[in-house]
From Swiss-Prot:
SUPFAM superfamilies from the UniProt entry: P-loop containing nucleoside triphosphate hydrolases
Record-linked Pfam families: SMC_N (PF02463)
One Gene Ontology biological process: DNA replication
Name used for this protein in its record: DNA replication and repair protein RecF
Keywords noted in UniProt: ATP-binding, Cytoplasm, DNA damage, DNA repair, DNA replication, DNA-binding, Nucleotide-binding, SOS response
Transmembrane segments: none
Family membership noted in the UniProt record: Belongs to the RecF family.
Broad class of where this protein is predominantly found: cytoplasm
Functional summary from the UniProt entry: The RecF protein is involved in DNA metabolism; it is required for DNA replication and normal SOS inducibility. RecF binds preferentially to single-stranded, linear DNA. It also seems to bind ATP.
Compartments, record wording: Cytoplasm
Organism: Mycobacterium sp. (strain JLS)
GO molecular function, one term: ATP binding
Gene Ontology, cellular component aspect: cytoplasm
InterPro entries, sorted: DNA-binding_RecF, DNA-binding_RecF_CS, P-loop_NTPase, RecF/RecN/SMC_N, RecF_2
Length: 380
């Protein structure tokens, strides 16, 4: 799989970008702040419908523009697919597949399969559980695009049930049973949708765990073994069915209802879960050194890459300024993996950040002042 063409309109610092890409290695070179990371971000957005840098879509639209458009042409085993994504503030985003509108942008998920390495990856180890949940959900969706719908349904249920919990506390003291009966209904919705999401995550971690262990040994041979485990808010067993999770969620919500009503929040469900990262007998978060944390973060990404490869065609590798963050051993390990990828797209502040033996096409990025303000450009 590779991206043959990338077109941007009013995306971040790019008023317009029109790039012909090719298999192999391509390096976008330019000083920090010149917009090279925005190219990688656009490709990641096309693959996941999300940014690796911000939680909302609004910052992706260039200042003063009404909308941003990301267009890609992806080649997979000789077949071309064109994806157009239109991002608009305050309105639902639109998508086209092969120039035809689709009902939901989620319908283009799976066209571009990518794995992104970025400086922000350190948050996978040192950050909040939400970072690790997002990692799991993005990877699960890349493997099975239907998971995006499961996640959207679950998020909708959480919003509705949280609003109901906030209003139910007062109704309870007034003796109004109708609100509590409605809460029972939403308990069922949360259990049904939450169980599907938890089962998808658990299945993913089951297949991911051995790849993480192998990747960590590649990056840090002779060190403590790395291990991962899906830790749920209901202390469920590993590798169980959606039916088990559904029953366990219903039981946990029954037991914790008083606490939920008192606090007005959902205390049970996959939005409270975590991906447990361990080095030897210690948790990585709080105990891993800076180097160990980087090795664990890279292991998660390398494992994702290997898992996607076994599922089908090679995913596109996106390396956002990561070589500058790594020591020599980790740079060699990452370069070794990248050597076998069908397409690798890399950003670097200076060419010296790239392995010296890489045969890579270089595209120089610069900034220019014009009628659109200060915008990113490709040096001709």
């Amino acid at each position: 799989m590779f991206v043959r063409h990338l077109t941007l309109t009013d995306f971040r610092s790019w008023a317009r970008a029109d790039l012909e890409l090719e298999p192999g290695r391509t390096v976008f070179v330019g000083p920090n702040g010149f917009g090279k990371t925005n190219l990688v971000e656009a490709l990641w957005y096309s693959a996941t419908l999300g940014s690796h840098r911000v939680a909302s879509d609004a910052p992706l639209i260039r200042a003063g523009a009404p909308r941003a458009v990301v267009s890609t042409i992806v080649v997979n085993e000789g077949r071309e697919l064109a994806v157009d994504l239109e991002i608009t503030t305050g309105r639902a985003n639109k998508a086209r597949l092969n120039r035809s509108p689709v009902r939901s942008p989620r319908e283009v998920l799976g066209v571009l399969r990518a794995v992104l390495f970025a400086p922000e990856d350190l948050a996978l180890v040192r950050g909040d559980p939400g970072e690790r949940r997002r990692y799991l959900d993005e990877l699960a969706t890349t493997r099975r695009p239907s998971i995006a719908g499961v996640r959207a349904d679950y998020d909708r249920v959480i919003r509705q049930r949280t609003a109901l919990l906030k209003s139910a506390a007062g109704a309870r003291y007034r003796g109004d049973r109708s609100v509590l009966e409605t809460l029972d209904v939403w308990d069922g919705h949360l259990a049904a949708h939450g169980a599907l999401l938890m089962a998808a995550r658990a299945d993913l971690v089951h297949h991911l765990a051995p790849e993480v262990e192998k990747a960590y040994q590649l990056l840090a041979p002779g060190s403590r073994p790395a291990a991962i485990r899906y830790r749920t808010s209901i202390d469920a067993e590993d590798d169980v069915s959606a039916e088990y999770y559904e029953a366990a969620l219903l039981d946990a919500m029954t037991r914790r209802r008083d606490a939920e009503l008192e606090r007005g929040v959902c205390l049970v469900g996959p939005h409270r879960d975590d991906l447990e990262l361990r080095l030897g007998d210690q948790m990585a978060k709080g105990y891993a050194s800076h180097g160990e944390s980087w090795s664990m973060a890279l292991s998660l990404r390398l494992a994702a890459y290997e898992l996607l490869r076994t599922d089908g065609s090679d995913p596109v590798l996106l390396l956002d300024d990561v070589f500058a963050e790594l020591d020599a051993a980790r740079r060699r390990a990452l370069a070794e993996v990248a050597a076998s990828a069908e397409q690798v797209l890399v950003t670097a502040a200076v060419a010296e950040d790239i392995p010296a033996d890489w045969d890579a096409r270089r595209i120089v990025i610069r900034m220019q002042d014009d009628d659109d303000g200060r915008v990113s450009m490709v040096e001709s």
